[in-house]
């Protein structure tokens, strides 16, 4: 949903979580926009997460979702700027939205990035810069402006 980047994780038992990049998402707008889809799929409303959370098989810490053996990092700010690690963390999907002003290269000292997802909230010029970074670094890149919603079966 535009200007509300989030990752929706569904468990086989019908439980689900909506991990939000923004600490103050417009929850009522989210529910209005997405409840028809949830109802169609006979899903209960997800648990909306804006901060750290963990339960059996699912964790959301420092805007990194760990679920079903995958890691998805929601990036919308400078939280990782000027940070380094001797053992970069593998990130399956780096979901970048409005607010991130850096480059992909800056993140490679922290993360081993497999795929970058560019949110629709990014201005075109930022998307172009990040897409070029991905191309130069041989990292797969998906633009939600071009593709729309992304579903990843696990």
Indicate residue ranges for each PLM-predicted region.
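Extracytosolic and intramembrane catalytic regions of membrane-associated proteins
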Residues: 2-154
């Amino acid at each position: 949903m535009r200007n509300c980047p989030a990752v929706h994780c569904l468990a086989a038992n019908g439980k689900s979580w909506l991990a939000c990049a923004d600490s103050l998402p417009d929850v009522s707008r989210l529910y209005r926009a997405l409840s028809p889809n949830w109802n169609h799929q006979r899903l209960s409303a997800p648990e909306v997460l804006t901060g750290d959370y963990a339960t059996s098989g699912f964790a959301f810490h420092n805007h990194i979702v760990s679920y079903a053996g995958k890691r998805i990092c929601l990036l919308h700010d400078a939280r990782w700027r000027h940070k380094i690690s001797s053992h970069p963390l593998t990130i399956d999907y780096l979901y970048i939205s409005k607010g991130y002003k850096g480059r992909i290269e800056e993140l490679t000292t922290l993360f081993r990035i497999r795929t970058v997802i560019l949110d629709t909230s990014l201005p075109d010029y930022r998307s172009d810069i990040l897409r070029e970074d991905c191309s130069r670094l041989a990292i797969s890149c998906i633009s939600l402006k071009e593709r729309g919603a992304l579903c990843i079966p696990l």
